[in-house]
Amino acid sequence: MALTWNSIISAEKNKAYYQSMSEKIDAQRSLGKSIFPKEDHIFTAFDLTPFNDVKVVILGQDPYHGEGQAHGLSFSVLPGVKIPPSLRNMYKELAEDIPGFTIPEHGYLKTWAEQGVLLLNTVLTVEEAKAHSHAKFGWETFTDAIIKKINDDMEGVIFLLWGAHAQKKGANIDTSRHFILQAPHPSPLSAHRGFFGCKHFSQTNELLRQQNLSEINWGSVTSS
């Protein structure tokens, strides 16, 4: 039977850690706290990128914690929302790295997800205006299980690990079966330390070509 995110996520939801985490999040919601993203957006990354379609994983940390920003894809924001600084820097690198890439006026990365780029945060919820507020709730265990499934059941996936948090998260990826590209985080605090000039987007496409897989059209965001 082909693996699906539905079966993988259902198995995790039955575990004690997940049920405990759900109770904590529900308790916060019932106190009137704003939790991002909205409940029906928590698993957007999995909805847009089916398990067997995953070619690339871009690991983020926790969701954006401003009103209307987070929608379940790492680094991405919905159309009409101001482009966050880290994504702005990703676009700058793309413009240098990919011939013809035009920086879009929005930060909506859905077209990447639809091409097999799993835009995965390591923590999937956050309280409004409180970065990392759900970091210890259990999401790290959940996303460890997600990464392990990709590691164990797929071949040739390209992991883009930017910054110490993502690199630590990817420490157990089998590099004899998968590819890891590492750089500093694209945030304004660290982008100049080696994210700019890393050429990860063109390198990703080169690695896909070597496997006879279709490249990611990174510029698809401009026309979307």
Swiss-Prot record:
GO BP term, pick one: base-excision repair, AP site formation via deaminated base removal
Q: Known EC number(s)? A: 3.2.2.27
CDD domains registered for this protein in UniProt: UDG-F1-like
Q: Which reaction does it catalyse?
A: Hydrolyzes single-stranded DNA or mismatched double-stranded DNA and polynucleotides, releasing free uracil
Q: Which PROSITE patterns match?
A: U_DNA_GLYCOSYLASE (PS00130)
Q: Which GO terms describe its molecular function?
A: uracil DNA N-glycosylase activity
Q: Under which main EC class is this enzyme filed?
A: hydrolase
Which cellular components does GO assign to this protein? cytoplasm
Q: Which domain of life is it from?
A: Bacteria
Pfam families this protein is in? UDG
The record places the active site at: D62
For this UniProt record, the keywords arranged alphabetically read as follows: Cytoplasm, DNA damage, DNA repair, Hydrolase
Where, per UniProt, does this protein localize?
Answer: Cytoplasm
- Subcellular location, principal: cytoplasm
Q: Which residues form the signal peptide?
A: none
Against Gene3D superfamilies, the record matches this protein to: Uracil-DNA glycosylase-like domain
* Keyword Hydrolase on entry: yes
Q: Has UniProt tagged this entry with the keyword Hydrolase? A: yes
Enumerate the transmembrane spans: none
The record's section on NCBIfam families has: PRK05254.1-1, PRK05254.1-2, PRK05254.1-4, PRK05254.1-5, ung
What's the stated role of this polypeptide? Excises uracil residues from the DNA which can arise as a result of misincorporation of dUMP residues by DNA polymerase or due to deamination of cytosine.
The family this protein is said to belong to: Belongs to the uracil-DNA glycosylase (UDG) superfamily. UNG family.
This protein is called Uracil-DNA glycosylase
